[in-house]
Amino acid sequence: QAGKLVLMRADGEITNTHFRPMRKPMGMAVKSDRLTVGTAFGISDLRNTPAAAGTLEPHGKHDALFLPRAEYYTGDIDIHEMAWQNNELFFVNTRFSCLCKLNPDYSFDPVWRPAFISAYDPRDRCHLNGLALRDGKIRYVSALSQTDTPGGWRQHNSDGGVVIDLQNNQIVADK
């Protein structure tokens, strides 16, 4: 389902789904009672409201209800992946080829970019697209290529790809 966040829950022997319209949902992060989603132009922060979940029909079937509590405008930066590290939200800013953290005072706050990226540029130079945590800290990011030209990754779509260790800024896997 394009343009929808799909929420699922067990309902006896079946899986029940609920579709919530969102504009281009991609990256998602979960932290205790929070569900945070990167969308076409921002970040939506939803919070679990258990007391309200009990009022949903049919009664007794819902143990969580995530309601929108905050929206942050980022612009069209193509958020591909997100994660909570302690109390800070980090996300992959694919258009600017960098890792960012949420800062309510700015559209985004860049904290790291690959060594092969020479400047912040909204033209997607390497298609930075994934991240992974280790021991609760962001440790790895992935990109489709090591290119530093606007859209240069497209020429390596099927034969590129790297994983970078943020601890030492080294490529630990490539295709």
Residue ranges and their predicted role:
Residues Q1-K175:
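Sequence-structural signature of mature extracellular/luminal beta-sheet repeat domains
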